[in-house]
Amino acid sequence: RDEKGRLVRPYIYLWDDNVMAYPEFTQVIDELIATGKPFQFRQGLDERVLDEERAIALSKSRYHGDFIFAFDQWKQHDLIERKLKIWKRHCKKTTKFYLFCGYELTEDNDDKLFEDVYYLFRRIQILMSYGCLGYVMRHADYENHRLGNIYTQIARWCNQPQFYKKMSFEEFILRNQSYQEEHSSSTKTCKSLATYREFKRTYLDKWKKIKPLFQMKYELTINPANWEE
């Protein structure tokens, strides 16, 4: 509170869900900078409209927390990569992307689930190569499929940077099993490994396609040459 007892909020939060598309966006950033307070957009930013001017404005601001964008569909990957090259040239701060998945899954559509998981990992692969974090956002439809728990396991790995940056998805799954064996008397297969094995059995004919993505590691995938000139 100030000297008159009035509540003074330490941060400014903004709820506009598409503020980047506003023509006077850089003016808004300048006004926020002028307040002297850290600020944060509470919705994911739309990187598709990012340009040099917007990237510079955001990178010089007192932003609170991680910058968060959205990478919802694989078909956007060329555009997202072009914008990432701009963004990474100007911003050194941690950058995270929401990764939407699981939409319109039904209980018997195995092909759709495989393609959805495969292209989810292709998006993660791009983010890793640019030194960015992913955050898996599951639509409730993922629960319709008998293999829906694979999304839960992916989210448990991807949404926690200490795992995402240090181990592959496959290593994370195996670590769950070893942790259970080390800390309990149970001899059962843990839920994570059981889900992984069921996924592999179901898609054995496609396993060679997705296995390298499950074994992909952040530290071996990040490539500064993608954005450094």
Q: Where do the model's predicted regions map?
A:
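Extended, compositionally biased non-globular segments
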Residues: R89-H90, E115
